[in-house]
Protein backbone atom coordinates (compact mmCIF):
# COMPACT_ATOMS: atom_id res chain seq x y z
CA UNK A 1 0.00 0.00 0.00
CA UNK A 2 1.33 3.42 -0.94
CA UNK A 3 0.02 7.00 -1.16
CA UNK A 4 0.38 8.74 -4.54
CA UNK A 5 0.52 12.51 -4.06
CA UNK A 6 -1.85 14.52 -6.26
CA UNK A 7 0.13 17.73 -5.68
CA UNK A 8 3.33 18.90 -7.36
CA UNK A 9 6.65 19.42 -5.56
CA UNK A 10 5.49 22.90 -4.51
CA UNK A 11 2.35 21.53 -2.87
CA UNK A 12 -0.05 22.68 -5.60
CA UNK A 13 -2.43 20.97 -7.98
CA UNK A 14 -0.74 21.43 -11.39
CA UNK A 15 -2.79 23.59 -13.79
CA UNK A 16 -2.05 21.62 -16.98
CA UNK A 17 -0.88 18.18 -15.86
CA UNK A 18 -1.94 15.49 -13.41
CA UNK A 19 -5.56 16.02 -12.40
CA UNK A 20 -5.76 18.93 -14.88
CA UNK A 21 -3.98 17.31 -17.83
CA UNK A 22 -6.89 18.17 -20.11
CA UNK A 23 -6.68 21.88 -19.26
CA UNK A 24 -3.59 22.26 -21.47
CA UNK A 25 -4.94 23.70 -24.72
CA UNK A 26 -1.64 23.15 -26.56
CA UNK A 27 -1.65 19.35 -26.39
CA UNK A 28 -3.79 16.49 -27.64
CA UNK A 29 -5.98 16.13 -24.55
CA UNK A 30 -9.67 16.71 -23.86
CA UNK A 31 -10.85 19.09 -21.12
CA UNK A 32 -11.39 16.44 -18.40
CA UNK A 33 -8.41 14.19 -19.15
CA UNK A 34 -6.39 13.37 -16.04
CA UNK A 35 -3.64 11.13 -14.74
CA UNK A 36 -2.13 10.27 -11.39
CA UNK A 37 1.62 10.93 -11.35
CA UNK A 38 4.05 8.19 -10.32
CA UNK A 39 7.29 9.71 -9.14
CA UNK A 40 10.76 8.23 -8.71
CA UNK A 41 10.25 8.24 -4.94
CA UNK A 42 7.02 6.23 -5.33
CA UNK A 43 8.84 3.57 -7.33
CA UNK A 44 11.92 3.45 -5.12
CA UNK A 45 9.88 3.06 -1.94
CA UNK A 46 7.47 0.37 -3.21
CA UNK A 47 9.21 -2.14 -5.45
CA UNK A 48 6.26 -4.56 -5.32
CA UNK A 49 3.70 -2.07 -6.68
CA UNK A 50 5.46 -0.60 -9.69
CA UNK A 51 7.33 -2.98 -11.97
CA UNK A 52 9.53 -2.04 -14.94
CA UNK A 53 7.59 -1.51 -18.16
CA UNK A 54 7.13 -4.47 -20.45
CA UNK A 55 7.79 -4.08 -24.13
CA UNK A 56 5.99 -6.34 -26.57
CA UNK A 57 6.16 -5.68 -30.27
CA UNK A 58 3.47 -6.52 -32.80
CA UNK A 59 3.45 -5.76 -36.50
CA UNK A 60 1.94 -2.31 -36.08
CA UNK A 61 2.82 -1.06 -32.61
CA UNK A 62 4.86 -1.38 -29.48
CA UNK A 63 2.84 -1.71 -26.29
CA UNK A 64 4.44 -0.72 -23.00
CA UNK A 65 1.99 -2.52 -20.74
CA UNK A 66 -1.39 -4.11 -20.93
CA UNK A 67 -4.44 -2.40 -19.44
CA UNK A 68 -5.14 -3.14 -15.79
CA UNK A 69 -8.38 -3.26 -13.83
CA UNK A 70 -8.66 -1.21 -10.67
CA UNK A 71 -11.40 -1.01 -8.07
CA UNK A 72 -11.91 2.26 -6.23
CA UNK A 73 -12.94 2.38 -2.57
CA UNK A 74 -16.54 3.14 -3.59
CA UNK A 75 -16.74 -0.01 -5.75
CA UNK A 76 -16.20 1.73 -9.10
CA UNK A 77 -14.17 -0.41 -11.50
CA UNK A 78 -12.01 1.26 -14.11
CA UNK A 79 -9.65 0.10 -16.83
CA UNK A 80 -6.35 1.94 -16.52
CA UNK A 81 -2.87 1.91 -17.98
CA UNK A 82 0.58 2.65 -16.62
CA UNK A 83 1.91 5.18 -19.15
CA UNK A 84 4.86 7.34 -20.04
CA UNK A 85 8.36 6.39 -19.07
CA UNK A 86 11.09 7.41 -16.70
CA UNK A 87 14.42 5.67 -16.31
CA UNK A 88 15.38 4.51 -12.83
CA UNK A 89 18.56 2.49 -12.27
CA UNK A 90 18.77 1.56 -15.95
CA UNK A 91 15.16 0.35 -16.24
CA UNK A 92 12.07 2.07 -17.61
CA UNK A 93 9.08 2.62 -15.35
CA UNK A 94 5.73 4.30 -15.92
CA UNK A 95 5.40 7.92 -14.88
CA UNK A 96 1.61 8.05 -14.65
CA UNK A 97 -1.57 6.06 -14.22
CA UNK A 98 -4.36 6.97 -16.67
CA UNK A 99 -7.76 5.60 -17.55
CA UNK A 100 -8.04 3.85 -20.90
CA UNK A 101 -9.13 3.87 -23.57
CA UNK A 102 -10.50 7.33 -22.66
CA UNK A 103 -8.25 9.58 -20.56
CA UNK A 104 -11.24 11.63 -19.41
CA UNK A 105 -12.82 8.70 -17.53
CA UNK A 106 -10.44 9.23 -14.59
CA UNK A 107 -10.87 13.02 -14.67
CA UNK A 108 -14.66 12.84 -14.77
CA UNK A 109 -14.69 10.28 -11.95
CA UNK A 110 -12.45 12.36 -9.68
CA UNK A 111 -14.38 15.55 -10.47
CA UNK A 112 -17.61 13.83 -9.47
CA UNK A 113 -16.07 12.81 -6.14
CA UNK A 114 -14.68 16.31 -5.58
CA UNK A 115 -17.92 17.98 -6.72
CA UNK A 116 -16.08 19.90 -9.46
CA UNK A 117 -18.08 20.68 -12.63
CA UNK A 118 -16.89 18.97 -15.80
CA UNK A 119 -14.52 21.12 -17.83
CA UNK A 120 -13.36 23.07 -14.78
CA UNK A 121 -9.92 23.16 -13.17
CA UNK A 122 -9.33 21.11 -10.00
CA UNK A 123 -7.68 23.32 -7.36
CA UNK A 124 -5.98 22.91 -3.98
CA UNK A 125 -9.17 24.23 -2.42
CA UNK A 126 -11.17 21.36 -3.94
CA UNK A 127 -8.80 18.77 -2.48
CA UNK A 128 -8.64 20.56 0.88
CA UNK A 129 -12.44 20.75 1.07
CA UNK A 130 -12.65 17.05 0.18
CA UNK A 131 -10.05 16.11 2.77
CA UNK A 132 -7.37 14.31 0.73
CA UNK A 133 -4.40 15.25 -1.43
CA UNK A 134 -3.39 11.69 -2.30
CA UNK A 135 -4.73 8.39 -3.59
CA UNK A 136 -3.73 5.14 -1.89
CA UNK A 137 -2.76 2.32 -4.25
CA UNK A 138 -2.45 -1.33 -3.27
CA UNK A 139 -2.21 -4.68 -5.02
CA UNK A 140 -5.50 -6.56 -5.05
CA UNK A 141 -5.99 -10.06 -3.66
CA UNK A 142 -9.01 -10.50 -5.94
CA UNK A 143 -7.93 -12.29 -9.11
CA UNK A 144 -10.31 -10.22 -11.27
CA UNK A 145 -8.83 -6.90 -10.06
CA UNK A 146 -5.19 -5.83 -10.38
CA UNK A 147 -5.08 -2.84 -8.00
CA UNK A 148 -7.20 -1.14 -5.36
CA UNK A 149 -7.34 2.67 -5.35
CA UNK A 150 -8.58 4.45 -2.25
CA UNK A 151 -9.72 8.08 -2.27
CA UNK A 152 -12.01 7.78 0.74
CA UNK A 153 -12.20 10.33 3.53
Residue positions per predicted region:
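Hydrophobic, glycine-enriched assembly/anchoring segments
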Residues: 121-153
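Polyanion-binding interface signature
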Residues: 2-134
Amino acid sequence: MHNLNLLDSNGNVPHTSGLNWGQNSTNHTRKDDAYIAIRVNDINSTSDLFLPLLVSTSESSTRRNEPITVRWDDGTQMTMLFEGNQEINGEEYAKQLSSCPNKNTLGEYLKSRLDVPLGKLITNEHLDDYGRTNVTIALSHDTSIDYILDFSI
